[in-house]
Amino acid sequence: MQIDKIQIEAGWKEALKEEFLSENFARVKENFLRAKAAGEVYPPNALIFNAFNLTPFNAVKVVILGQDPYHGAGQAMGLSFSVPRGVKIPPSLANIYKEIRDDLGIAEPNSGDLSYWAKQGVLLLNATLSVSAGQANSHSGFGWQEFTSAAIRKLSERAQNVVFMLWGNPAKAKIPLIDANKHLVLTAAHPSPLARGAFFGCRHFSKANLYLAEHGKAPIDWDLNNAV
């Protein structure tokens, strides 16, 4: 990974230019290349920054923070909770769909591809952007956390009226990075069936759209059945 070869949207590249040149990112690259040499890494290189490329910096309306990419073959696509069309919908995403159904009356889609949301301004960001095959959280110590924290901090500083959906304790740990005076921070338990606490009934999707409308922004169409 070299900065001149990293394909990332221009707004994000400018916002994160200091981070890309930092000692931390040098450590990320070193750890990443070592992991690649040792075995299979997900997602494919071209999709590592997919969240930033599908949702330009100046277009972000909502942030949904995940932990790390899916570690099964063909699952990870660089968007938190999302899997490519045709791949079995993972349990956490199935629960997200159930909450949207209960919150907004939207029928559960048969695809796990969330690109439709990303293209409307939903930044689907994992705190860690890579993983070794079959080893959940295997890259959590690579320095990605500091990189994605910088992205959240820059959004908080430069953007206005963004909705941050933080599910589970690792996501909630990012709260200090966000200026709650000019953004909406929504918290709940993680949607995983294994998580403790309440995710169902959080109504984050309707709350997000209400907040966006109150601040003169077009709401998100959460209905993935409308995706072409």
What does each of the following model-derived ranges do?
Residues 6, 14, 18-166, 170-173, ...:
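A polyanion-binding, active-site-adjacent surface
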Residues 1-10:
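Generic N-terminal segment detector
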